[in-house]
Amino acid sequence: SGTSVSASGPGDSASGSSALKEGEISQPEDYFDLVFDTSQDQGKLTARYLYLQTIYGTGKEAVTTGDSAVYTSPDGMVMLVDCGNVPGGQEVTNQLLAMGVDKIDVLVLSHPHADHVGGFVTVADNFEIGQVYVNGHEYDSGTYRAMMEKIEQLSLPCEVLEAGDAFSLGEEVQVQVFGPTPGDTEEVAGGYLDANDGSIAMRLTYGQSSFWTSGDLYITGEQALTETYGQDIASDVVKMNHHGKDTSNGKDFVQAMSPKIAVGMFDSVASRTVAMRYIAGGAEVFYNSTD
């Protein structure tokens, strides 16, 4: 079903797994209903990290993949970050409908890889979308072209986010953008942009609580952030970079982030080293496939 985290008020800290009470974490009998029950959302900034069960690959290479998270502001504004892979778009749609969503106020596409933007066409066909944000990096793939064609077909407002930008989600949630760096078009081997390190990095803040998301940033991208911002990127809740893999979530990044809660978007523990790194830093670790 997924993992839900809420910040209850301007003076409260974030609590995990749709906590029933302040700071209480539990696994109820009907976990799906609690994760997608929005009756307790009012007055909270809530993040739901969706579990997409679509299988990619075969045999030992088969993995459940796709990345998508929903943030709901205290006054009911909805922001979707990424849409999963192509077949996962229907799963994202179904889970949004289970929440009673009929409009996505803000849709952020962190970077143009298929497991993050592939489901966009299906989502866009099912919901009104107020604003789309992208990282501005073009990508040579069918899913990227389909995404851009759908944006044009529906005449959706679409803007590029870069470090230094900021916007609001409702009246009380501020979103600060830390990456990618303006004009960051450095090419890597083969002449292609490093799509993962071009991921949009941003922090949502509500009162004293903060939520971080930065797509599939590699350790190189994380180092650029820590060298530029240091402890200024610290956040209460972090979605682990690159699904919690050890290509990302380096020691310096985890230390700078110092989260209370870390969420991995994968069908298992992608890296025990990464999980233990967050735990050693004082975080509770959750995976959207099991928690």
Regions found by a protein language model. Give the residues of each.
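Binuclear metal-ion centers of metallo-dependent hydrolases, dominated by the metallo-beta-lactamase
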Residues: 131, 138-196, 261, 266-291
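Active-site proximal loops enriched in glycine and acidic residues that flank catalytic Cys/His/Asp
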Residues: 51, 83, 136, 215-217, ...
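Short, solvent-exposed amphipathic alpha-helical segments in soluble enzyme
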Residues: 228-229, 255, 279-280
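Active-site metal-binding motif and surrounding structural segment of the metallo-beta-lactamase
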Residues: 74-79, 86-137, 228-245, 258-263
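Core dinuclear metal-dependent hydrolase active-site scaffold
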Residues: 9-103, 152, 160-233
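Metal-dependent catalytic neighborhoods of phosphoester/phosphodiester hydrolases
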Residues: 94, 117-126, 141-148, 250-254, ...
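Active-site environment of divalent metal-dependent phosphoester hydrolases
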Residues: 86-88, 112-117, 139-142, 165-168, ...
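Sec-dependent N-terminal signal peptides of Gram-positive bacterial secreted proteins and lipoproteins
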Residues: 1-3
